[in-house]
Regions:
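Sec-exported extracytoplasmic/periplasmic mature domains
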Residues: 81-86, 90, 178-190
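Surface-exposed short loop/turn segments
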Residues: 23-30, 93-145, 154-158
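A structural "domain/chain start" motif
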Residues: 21-80, 187-205
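Mid-chain, structured segments of secreted extracytoplasmic proteins
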Residues: 72-97, 107
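Bacterial N-terminal signal peptides that target proteins for export
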Residues: 1-10
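Short secondary-structure boundary motifs at beta->alpha junctions and helix caps
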Residues: 62-69, 139-186
């Protein structure tokens, strides 16, 4: 009798997990979930282009899931860029660039992936966001195209709805993107070389 009860409970729990993972999820990630970046920026000017597609981006990693991260990623990465550059303008297109001797950076989302407990048999939800940063100088010459992956997962999805779990994983992924941008941007060799050239030109003038 005891074994029968355990079997029934286990079956009910498995059904609950499967049902939760197979349901649809429309996720809206809010800006308020991200703290202000505290970082000392370098004496570099940059024009950051967040175009309409980026600002309004809604990921559809599968036919049952949509994740609206447009405003959240604009806010999060905008804060991170402010921690990198002492002089910054956030604009919507290259036509609005007003700085000279500056970096012009256009972020874009290449891919968003989601993994649920039904995919991995683990009690976690995971989100991967693959960013690309197109980096030019103010004359329109390309400096680099930098690939920046970000990852987030829930510590435990038990007692979370599918929508809430994916939202939590997406928030962690966006925070990961902001942290990587702050830590790794000036380690890009082409950025370092550009800064050296600009410094030499400034010394010659």
């Amino acid at each position: 009798m005891q074994k029968t009860k355990i079997h029934i409970i286990a079956s009910a729990f498995a059904l609950l997990v499967i049902t939760g993972c197979s349901s649809s999820a429309q996720v809206q990630v809010a800006e308020r979930q991200f703290p202000t970046v505290v970082s000392k920026p370098k004496a570099v000017s940059a024009s950051i282009i967040f175009d309409e597609k980026f600002r309004d981006f809604v990921a559809t990693p599968n036919k049952k899931t949509s994740i609206d991260i447009g405003s959240a990623q604009t806010y999060m990465l905008g804060n991170a860029f402010k921690g990198l550059f002492s002089n910054i303008e956030i604009i919507s297109s290259k036509d609005e660039v007003s700085f000279e001797n500056a970096l012009v950076i256009t972020p874009s989302v290449q891919e968003v992936q989601v993994s649920t407990p039904s995919d991995t048999y683990l009690n976690v939800y995971e989100v991967w966001i693959k960013y690309s940063l197109d980096i030019e100088n103010s004359d329109g010459d390309q400096i680099d195209s930098w690939f920046m992956p970000a990852y987030g997962k829930t510590p435990d999805s038990f007692m979370l709805s599918k929508t809430n779990a994916i939202e939590e994983a997406a928030v962690i992924a966006l925070r990961d993107a902001g942290a990587k941008l702050l830590l790794d941007f000036y380690r890009i060799p082409s950025i370092y070389n550009w800064m050296v050239r600009e410094r030499k030109l400034g010394d010659e003038q």
